[in-house]
């Protein structure tokens, strides 16, 4: 029975799923906008939003937790120096998920995932 099982399996083993979600979160935090399938985007929200919440309180313990979850020093620096202060006044809801049509090859529903408060210069350039 499937009672109280929170996460989507996404047809992957647990280690593959964890690695994929970590890579998606790192890409999102690095580029601030990515395109992926809709189920992956919805699951990514559960991984990326707590990371941004960690970045709002710059302590050594939070930096170590963020590094444990991302395994990327550049992302941790950006998270605490840039994204944490940017979202300091927002209580959750850091991501925007927009439906982006269907993929050409297999007709999978696609989604555009972006950070809500992106700088205007970057948003206009892309």
UniProtKB/Swiss-Prot annotation:
Keywords tagged on the record: Ribonucleoprotein, Ribosomal protein
Recorded hits in InterPro entries, A to Z, give: Ribosomal_bL17 (IPR000456), Ribosomal_bL17_CS (IPR047859), Ribosomal_bL17_sf (IPR036373)
Q: Where exactly are the transmembrane stretches of this chain?
A: none
* Superkingdom: Bacteria
Drop me one GO molecular function for this one.
structural constituent of ribosome
Q: Which GO terms describe its cellular component?
A: cytosolic large ribosomal subunit
Question: What SUPFAM superfamilies does the annotation carry?
Answer: Prokaryotic ribosomal protein L17
Q: Which Pfam families match?
A: Ribosomal_L17 (PF01196)
User: GO terms for biological process?
Assistant: translation
- What's the family? Belongs to the bacterial ribosomal protein bL17 family.
Subunit field text: Part of the 50S ribosomal subunit. Contacts protein L32.
Give the protein's recorded name.
Answer: Large ribosomal subunit protein bL17
- The record lists the organism as Laribacter hongkongensis (strain HLHK9)
Q: What gene makes this protein?
A: rplQ
């Amino acid at each position: 029975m499937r009672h109280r099982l929170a996460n989507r399996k996404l047809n992957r083993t647990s280690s593959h799923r964890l690695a994929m979600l970590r890579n998606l979160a790192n890409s999102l935090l690095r580029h601030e906008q990515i395109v992926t399938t809709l189920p992956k985007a919805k699951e990514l929200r559960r991984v990326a939003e707590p990371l941004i919440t960690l970045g709002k309180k710059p302590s050594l313990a939070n930096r170590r937790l963020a590094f444990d979850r991302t395994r990327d020093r550049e992302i941790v620096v950006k998270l605490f120096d840039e994204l944490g202060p940017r979202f300091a006044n927002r209580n959750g809801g850091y991501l925007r998920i927009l439906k982006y049509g269907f993929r050409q090859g297999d007709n999978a529903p696609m989604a555009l995932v972006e950070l809500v408060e992106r700088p205007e210069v970057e948003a206009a350039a892309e």
